[in-house]
Amino acid sequence: MDVNLVVLHTTVIDDRGRFADGLKQENFRVLEDKVEQKLSLFKREDIPVSMGLVIDNSGSMRDKRPRVNQAALTLVEASNPQDEAFVVNFNDDFYLDLDKDFTNSVPELKEALERIDSRGSTALYDAVIGSLDHVKKGKKDKKVLLIVTDGEDNTSHNSLEKTVREVQKTDTVIYAIGLLSEESKKSAKRAKRALEEITKASGGLAYFPENAEDVRSICEQVAHDIRNQYTLAYYPTNTKRDGTFRAVQVEVVPPRGRGRLQARTRNGYYAPGGPTGSTSGN
């Protein structure tokens, strides 16, 4: 994909939280650093994705893993049949638990999810950055990560700030499920903030269910979200290749007779070039 093209995978919902169908290009306004941009690409299709299942494998997850594994498979089964996926299990470190980069085989993903020995700490940020790196190898233009964890990061080499920055260098959409009910109030608050910052930067969502039984229905919602997005893309009017962060905003102008509509997409990107050496695309 052209590194100068900025791609925005965008979810639009109404006041009741339902997906807004039937919108056209003229219903969208895209602003970069508050300057309106002209769309070069607009589509709403159920396009296949390259997806990473990034699952906490620390000691505290031992009793939750069977339900979480089943929920992750539900996500795969409810997604586009042409999707490709990989599994990362993480504790003190992170592990790619497939014999190949990606697969669309549910039995192979099931085997990778069950290849666990729940122990150790939670290196969430390292796992997210490693998974962002791996998902770039995917053949599909659209990239997605699902993170499931039950606590705050307590052992990563990378910081939350660096992780968010790495997210903003890609157009990968990240969803997170935080099973935080057994954490102390302070720890749960820090973990919630981290997951919200990571997902918001990407245009995804963070969910915080009370228990592991709810993870399956959340995974069904995530699959539905992925399959009901609009893809918007533009060439920025600011052509400087200076590596700076550009804030992006998508506004929806509802057709007559439709109520208020709200767009959710990534909050910006890093321009190509400059000291960061980053790109705006994949």
In which residue ranges do the predicted regions lie?
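Scaffold/interface architecture of coatomer-like assemblies
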Residues: 1-282
